[in-house]
């Protein structure tokens, strides 16, 4: 697939630092930001004046944060202040309506966002209309794929941080995702009306924990219940929110008691920008005071270059400080023409091609989300090049299938607005397109392909069976639909246990799908106990020498393979805590002179990877194993691809057991938050679950503990946490790495697997 400047930065973001050497680094594709800027300017030279005007007033943004930081409440204010909705509805409002962006019944009942929701809104700034495509994303780690696919197609984001809790576990996850897709952000410190709100501590945490240069461009007027508005440090004016819902902005002079603080924070802003912007650095060296225009320009340049994030503050729930964030989105976040997007030209040996956001260019778009709507499958598309028009035909670059678009819509949560066309840089949805998330579409004039989003592996599984055998048809429909919608939701049938197994990112993730099956398909299911996704690997090398011989009259089977099996992982580095177990399996052939024909080697390769799907210890997937074949024998009559396939499979199992095999269990990063009086109870609970505590953050109201714990210890943890914190604690889990389980647990798992196999043999 694609090597995109925007999309494939799994190894790290194109991060920049204040230092000259770091400014030259670009971990994605080996280019500097200046080189990227040169490409942007070159592409802008190939678009029309109409394209430039249209794109300059367009923003594709996401709202991301830790769970319960106020993302959806903030999104509701955006809808209200832009005139998209006529009244404000809260996430847990008393009017029974619920937030507009949480359109699923389950979301409104649980008070959390499960699916990302998109909307289109218009904001007027300085008498200019700016058009926003806004995507509100979930905060819970179990629904991380919703954040991944949103950030994949967005040009900028608003990172919402709680003024009381500061940077939390999922904040750090979202930060990594933004870096993966090179998405610049502005930061909004929310909940400034809460007791214990400390925006300066939150900014310090952004700098320290996220390793991102951040500085305030606002100072709050008042605090907690007396929060009245904000002072704009750049423009040096005060903004007050008046009206019943804070809809009226009153501009005034800076309050006398805040002038000293504003001057201090303005100096700090200039110092921070001097580290990342040459123009401000020159002013700083010459001891000149930058003008407002110079500061605004520097903030925009540094934000788009992802070397800096401007920090705004307020309270979405109290209707304070939201409108200035909308202005900041217009002023500091990039429009679609400021971002380099690259595809591969399949007909030209996958040569990278920069996409031009011009209306007259050949159409190129990416399907980033599928949803089952009232009128069939709804496919969300981001248009990167050209125009998408109602009635035109588009071609799936992967399958070659052609589809005529009968309907184009802009989304407003679960409502739709029909449109005749959408241009480059826009997001829309359509019906009747058979595809998967991440598929590229063109109009047939070009053969381009774009990369998909990063999809993490599931960490938890459970068996599921419909109670009523008459529901099997609907059960199958639900499974097929959910898999198409969510790449992190996996389904497979276990031939040994004769059970359907579903896998996902956590207990809540699977619980939601079981509940959706009941509500949307009227299928009530029984579920087994959640099972950990164990893995198997080896820790030492051993020689491989296996002969498969079978004679049964006529042509028999003969294959001999000689070589070695060894761990891919550097075990010394693992033992020293400098590395984790490798995830890939590697097959190598060093056969010379045609001693084993190439077609038999290919059969060995396929058999090796197939066999690695089920290890000999517990039937779990094998990872981090290398098989080398450097010798062997064949028989002129009896050797075949099947014989070498069997020899590889049996040789794999036999040698695997000689390589000091171990079972690996998923280790999770766990973060607990509760009122400070429960600190002792949280520590005791972590110790009880054999967690290794790595960090404590004790605030005025809350205490946060972070550490690592095996997933096996975390089942039922929510119940124990509620009990020891009187229902006031919360926790989050995120997969960290695989590590060997204890010898005692390994023996238990191996014995249980052997008993299961014996029971199946006896049953036959």
Swiss-Prot record:
This is Elongation factor G, mitochondrial. It is found in: Mitochondrion. Keywords: Elongation factor, GTP-binding, Mitochondrion, Nucleotide-binding, Protein biosynthesis, Transit peptide. Residues 1-23 form a transit peptide. Residues 56-337 form the tr-type G domain. Belongs to the TRAFAC class translation factor GTPase superfamily. Classic translation factor GTPase family. EF-G/EF-2 subfamily. Pfam families: EFG_C (PF00679), EFG_III (PF14492), EFG_IV (PF03764), GTP_EFTU (PF00009), GTP_EFTU_D2 (PF03144). InterPro entries: EFG_II, EFG_III, EFG_III/V, EFG_IV, EFG_V, EFG_V-like, EFTu-like_2, P-loop_NTPase. GO terms for biological process: mitochondrial translational elongation. Pathway: Protein biosynthesis; polypeptide chain elongation. GTP binds at residues 65-72, 136-140, 190-193. CDD domains: EF-G, EFG_III, EFG_mtEFG1_IV, mtEFG1_C, mtEFG1_II_like. GO terms for molecular function: GTP binding; GTPase activity; translation elongation factor activity. GO terms for cellular component: mitochondrion. Transmembrane segments: none annotated. Mitochondrial GTPase that catalyzes the GTP-dependent ribosomal translocation step during translation elongation. During this step, the ribosome changes from the pre-translocational (PRE) to the post-translocational (POST) state as the newly formed A-site-bound peptidyl-tRNA and P-site-bound deacylated tRNA move to the P and E sites, respectively. Catalyzes the coordinated movement of the two tRNA molecules, the mRNA and conformational changes in the ribosome.
């Amino acid at each position: 697939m694609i090597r995109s400047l925007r999309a494939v930065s799994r190894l790290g973001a194109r991060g920049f630092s204040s230092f000259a050497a770091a400014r030259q680094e670009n971990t994605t594709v080996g280019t500097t930001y200046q080189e990227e800027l040169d490409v942007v300017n070159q592409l802008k030279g190939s678009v029309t004046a109409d394209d430039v005007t249209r794109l300059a007033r367009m923003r594709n943004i996401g709202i991301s944060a830790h769970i319960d930081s106020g993302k959806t409440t903030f999104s509701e204010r955006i809808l209200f202040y832009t005139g998209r909705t006529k009244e404000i509805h809260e996430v847990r409002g008393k009017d029974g309506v619920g937030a507009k962006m949480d359109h699923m019944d389950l979301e409104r009942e649980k008070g959390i966002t499960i699916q990302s929701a998109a909307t289109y809104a218009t904001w007027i700034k300085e008498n200019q209309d700016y058009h926003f495509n806004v995507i509100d994303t979930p905060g819970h780690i179990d629904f991380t794929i919703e954040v991944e696919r949103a950030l994949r197609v967005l040009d900028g984001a608003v990172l919402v941080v709680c003024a009381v809790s500061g940077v939390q576990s999922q904040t750090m996850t979202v930060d990594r995702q933004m870096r993966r897709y090179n998405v610049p952000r502005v930061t909004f410190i929310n909940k400034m009306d809460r007791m214990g709100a400390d925006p300066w501590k939150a900014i310090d945490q952004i700098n320290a924990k996220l390793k991102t240069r951040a500085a305030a461009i606002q100072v709050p007027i008042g605090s907690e219940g007396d929060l009245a508005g904000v002072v704009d440090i750049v423009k040096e004016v005060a903004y007050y929110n008046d009206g019943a819902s804070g809809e009226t902005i009153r501009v005034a002079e800076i309050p006398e008691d805040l002038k000293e603080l504003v001057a201090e924070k303005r100096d700090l802003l200039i110092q921070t920008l001097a580290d990342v912007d040459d123009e401000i650095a020159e002013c700083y060296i010459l001891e000149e005071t930058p003008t407002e225009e110079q500061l605004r320009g520097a903030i925009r340049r540094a934000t788009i270059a992802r070397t800096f994030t401007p920090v705004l503050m307020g309270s979405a729930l109290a209707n304070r400080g939201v409108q200035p964030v909308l202005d900041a989105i217009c002023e500091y976040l990039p429009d679609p023409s400021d971002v380099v997007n690259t595809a591969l030209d399949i007909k030209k040996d996958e040569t990278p091609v920069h996409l031009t956001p011009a209306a007259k260019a050949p159409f190129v778009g990416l399907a980033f989300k599928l949803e089952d709507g009232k009128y069939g499958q709804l496919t969300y598309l981001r248009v990167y090049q050209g125009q998408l028009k109602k009635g035109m035909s588009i071609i799936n670059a992967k399958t070659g299938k052609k589809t005529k678009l009968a309907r184009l819509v802009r989304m407003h949560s679960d409502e739709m607005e029909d449109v005749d066309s959408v241009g480059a840089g826009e997001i829309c949805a359509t019906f009747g397109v058979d595809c998967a998330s991440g598929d590229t579409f063109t109009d047939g004039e070009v053969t381009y392909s774009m990369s998909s989003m990063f999809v993490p592996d599931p960490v938890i599984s459970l068996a599921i069976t419909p109670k009523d055998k008459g529901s099997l048809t609907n059960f199958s429909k639900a499974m097929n639909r959910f898999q198409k919608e969510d790449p992190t939701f996996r389904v497979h049938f276990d031939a040994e246990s004769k059970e359907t197994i579903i896998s996902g990112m956590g207990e809540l993730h699977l619980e939601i799908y079981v509940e959706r099956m009941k509500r949307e398909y009227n299928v009530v299911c029984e579920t087994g106990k959640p099972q950990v996704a164990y893995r198997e690997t080896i820790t030492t090398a051993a020689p491989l020498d296996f002969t498969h011989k079978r004679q049964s009259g006529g042509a028999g089977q003969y294959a001999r393979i000689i070589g070695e099996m060894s761990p891919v992982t550097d075990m010394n580095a693992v033992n020293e805590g400098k590395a984790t177990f490798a995830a890939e399996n590697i097959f190598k052939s060093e056969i010379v002179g045609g001693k084993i024909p190439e077609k038999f080697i290919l059969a060995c390769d396929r058999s090796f990877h197939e066999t690695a799907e089920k290890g000999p210890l517990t039937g779990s997937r094998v990872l981090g194993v290398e098989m080398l074949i450097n010798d062997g024998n064949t028989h002129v009559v009896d050797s075949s691809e099947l014989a070498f396939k069997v020899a590889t499979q049996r040789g794999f199992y036999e040698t695997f057991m000689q390589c000091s095999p171990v079972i690996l269990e998923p280790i999770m990063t766990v973060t607990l938050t509760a009122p400070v009086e429960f600190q002792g109870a949280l520590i005791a609970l972590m110790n009880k679950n054999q967690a290794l505590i790595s960090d404590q953050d004790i605030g005025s109201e809350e205490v946060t503990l972070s550490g690592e714990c095996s997933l096996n210890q975390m089942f039922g943890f929510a119940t124990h946490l509620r009990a020891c914190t009187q229902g006031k604690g919360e926790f989050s889990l995120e997969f960290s790495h695989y590590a060997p389980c204890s010898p005692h647990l390994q023996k238990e798992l191996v014995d249980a697997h052997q008993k299961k196999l014996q029971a199946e043999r006896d049953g036959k």
